[in-house]
Regions:
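Sec-dependent signal peptide recognition
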Residues: 2-7
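N-terminal signal peptide c-region/cleavage motif recognized by signal peptidases
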Residues: 14-15
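Contiguous interface-forming segments/domains that mediate binding rather than catalysis
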Residues: 19-196
């Protein structure tokens, strides 16, 4: 019995040690407020979505507990800066969706990687869409595995509410029904997709 307890204690310590010491595993997660993470930070303008300091453990994103967050001894800004180095582009499938006139309406990005949603925070994410959509884009993140990118100018993104809401409702890991603007100034929520 003592060995089992010792092994359990060691495994719990190992998870905490990884979270605290392996900064390469740190990520800023974009999560729904209804998950009630112990530690979260606001996204400008967002009501239903927050930033959560997290880390990868056994292939899954985990939230920092309040105790583990405090134990890191880092500020939110320092954590974000370090996590941004980890927010590299993932291997994802993406496609440009065009209208009948062959004009790109949006980009659909999906992957089985549970960090797909975090790619919008990668330093080069905005640059990838600059030539197609301009320097400011709108983004929908309905679940951890799916991102939709829309042009900010002359965008009809609200026409896609049924698509976004279906991806949000049907997921085991929903993220947000909100729409975000990403620009050189950062990320902020600008509205909410709604069911028709």
């Amino acid at each position: 019995m003592g060995r089992i307890f010792a092994l359990l204690l060691m495994s719990l310590f190992a998870v905490h040690a990884v979270a605290q010491q392996d900064q390469k595993a740190w990520h800023v997660l974009i999560e729904p407020t209804f998950m009630h993470p112990e530690v979260s930070f606001p996204i400008s303008g967002a009501r239903r979505t927050v930033f959560v300091p997290g880390y990868m453990s056994d292939g899954d994103p985990q939230y920092f507990s309040k105790k583990d967050w405090d134990a890191t001894g880092v500020t939110w800004d320092a954590f974000r800066a370090r996590a941004a180095q980890n927010a590299i582009e993932k291997k994802v499938s993406g496609q440009l969706i065009r209208d009948q006139n062959k004009v790109v309406q949006y980009a659909a990005i999906s992957s089985e990687d549970p960090l797909t949603a975090t790619m919008v925070l990668a330093p080069d994410f905005l640059k990838k869409f600059k030539d197609i959509f301009g320097t400011t884009i709108f983004v929908a993140i309905p679940n951890r595995f799916t991102v939709y990118v829309f042009p900010a100018l002359a965008s009809e993104y609200k026409d896609y509410s049924p698509l976004i809401m279906r991806a949000y409702r049907d997921s085991t890991y929903p993220v947000s029904p909100e729409v975000f603007e990403i620009s050189p100034g950062g990320i902020r929520a600008i509205g909410v997709f709604e069911d028709d």
